[in-house]
Amino acid sequence: MDYLGIDLSCAIGSLRNGEFPAKDCLLPLISKLLGYFLVAASMTVKLPQIMKIVDNKSVKGLSVVAFELEVIGYTISLAYCLNKDLPFSAFGELAFLLIQALILVACIYYFSQPLSVTTWVKAILYFAIAPTVFAGKIDPFLFEALYASKHLIFLSARIPQIWKNFRNKSTGQLSFLTCLMNFGGALARVFTSIQEKAPLSMLLGIVLSIFTNGIIMSQILLYRSKGNEDKLVKSKKIS
């Protein structure tokens, strides 16, 4: 019995016989189900960040470069997976993350007006080149090189935000919930990637994501806790 690429016959057969499914049967099943869960969960990952920006009408403390690089990274990753005909459960979340990342950058641009000429040029170039990349109409060697560079791109996307947080001693409008979901999703992807026998480079990228998102989460907790303490001290002085 195969449903959405998930082979259920092994597990169902064991349960019918009153037996608990064996490890070799259960782990791949869990991996597939977890993969589809991550795809479903990815539909809301960046919504807390988008809502926080819209509600506060502010992008204070956010690194524009960081979010722009995320869009590039998701674009390359999704295009590569589509052209390699990988199963949707293995990369489906990339489609939803890219859509949300584009909305997020649009929100940042909207609340950062007036926009510079450079910003307009970057936006035009992206929408001019992206369709070609998605169609796979580029040199195969260049495509492989772009995909190999995605880990560096995502790492570069986190570093400006981490540095800005450290420099300002504040995380501004960063959403803790979005960072937490990114962190948890990366942890789950370690398991699914090992089960799907993903290449070492992919695992390395996931580990880097866990590390950088962990740093940003700790910064949010540290600086917001410090900010609350400062407010408490000021209120006591006033009273």
Swiss-Prot record:
GO cellular component, one term: membrane
Keywords of the record: Membrane, Repeat, Transmembrane, Transmembrane helix, Transport
Record's subcellular location: Membrane
Gene3D superfamilies recorded: 1.20.1280.290
Keyword Repeat: yes
InterPro entries: MannP-dilichol_defect-1 (IPR016817), PQ-loop_rpt (IPR006603)
Family, similarity comment: Belongs to the MPDU1 (TC 2.A.43.3) family.
This protein's name: Mannose-P-dolichol utilization defect 1 protein homolog 1
